[in-house]
Amino acid sequence: MDKFRVQGPTKLQGEVTISGAKNAALPILFAALLAEEPVEIQNVPKLKDVDTSMKLLSQLGAKVERNGSVHIDARDVNVFCAPYELVKTMRASIWALGPLVARFGQGQVSLPGGCSIGARPVDLHISGLEQLGATIKLEEGYVKASVEGRLKGAHIVMDKVSVGATVTIMCAATLAEGTTIIENAAREPEIVDTANFLVTLGAKISGQGTDRITIEGVERLGGGVYRVLPDRIETGTFLVAAAISRGKIICRNAQPDTLDAVLAKLRDAGADIETGDDWISLDMHGKRPKAVNVRTAPHPAFPTDMQAQFTLLNLVAEGTGFITETVFENRFMHVPELSRMGAHAEIESNTVICHGVEKLSGAQVMATDLRASASLVLAGCIAEGTTIVDRIYHIDRGYERIEDKLRALGANIERVKGE
């Protein structure tokens, strides 16, 4: 397994170009299964999960090519089962189910894998599809969905806000007969992006970005060209990198209006922030950040995917900060690893109390999930001495060339090939 070796401390400064959003690219790739004409998807990040999704679409019979953009032609899809071999590494594969059953009347997906953070059950996906008229069976580790004729529009009230299930229901409803209303829908920018992609193909969707999405079913979806929105979590991660190293950064190809909650907390921490249409700049003027209190919740509140990075910020900030995680359980696995580097923190149920220290020291640490591992790499950039971050395959699932981008900002980081 590959590792990162990071020498610190360094001040991170310069410019970084933000990649397309993984959390929009994945649902959009699977939504392309609904199209009866070729689609071109631009600004798709080069990531492990994206490669796995493309491989899965190919196995289903779609023609998939990548030459800058990703081209998908799903006209000849003739396999309706997403096998365990591919699904086990990535829970996003569940998003194949809605498009398959909506367009072909059948689909099966192995129960998914992915990051090990808390219970992320597929029951909300299943109940949504059942309400649209699909018959669902769980057999031999597979979710099997089928319908006679077309799915039927329905008024669906989500038990809890779920990005994944909102995507599944919205995609399936585009080809259903009649109108579907999703109440308590997720409002994330990536949901809006997926909806806008479907509209480009001819879907009739309104209300995306609010908690009530309306989909009027159409008979077929055509082709089109679509550009994936910038990755707000990657943007936030690099902004935190500059903040904790007392540096200065400009993020290009960013979308500031998707990051309001994060930018507000960075300003509270003492950062000087400016924004334009597609850029964000942050300048700490050489100052140490101030501790902030953060509570994660569904969008537009503070994103859970930025929690680990802000935990790190608080651990090297002036003062004491409280971080409360309300979205996923079991999401403080980075805290004991950061403690090995000299951080002072206590975990009390779903809150971590961070007591800022002047400096961290390099250590050997282990990545546990995608965002936690990014925070360990950033910790290595500002710690004194050498930090080895193990199991970095987690990072490769969600960050495109993170070491190259950090190096361009002045980090001393190298990838060490594993046995």
UniProtKB/Swiss-Prot annotation:
UniProt entry keywords in alphabetical sequence: Cell cycle, Cell division, Cell shape, Cell wall biogenesis/degradation, Cytoplasm, Peptidoglycan synthesis, Pyruvate, Transferase
2-(S-cysteinyl)pyruvic acid O-phosphothioketal: modified positions: C115
InterPro entries: Enolpyruvate_Tfrase_dom, Enolpyruvate_Tfrase_sf, MurA_subfamily, RNA3'P_cycl/enolpyr_Trfase_a/b, UDP_GlcNAc_COvinyl_MurA
EC number from the UniProt entry: 2.5.1.7
Pathway assigned to this chain's UniProt record: Cell wall biogenesis; peptidoglycan biosynthesis
Annotated HAMAP family: MurA (MF_00111)
Protein name: UDP-N-acetylglucosamine 1-carboxyvinyltransferase
Taxonomic source organism: Escherichia fergusonii (strain ATCC 35469 / DSM 13698 / CCUG 18766 / IAM 14443 / JCM 21226 / LMG 7866 / NBRC 102419 / NCTC 12128 / CDC 0568-73)
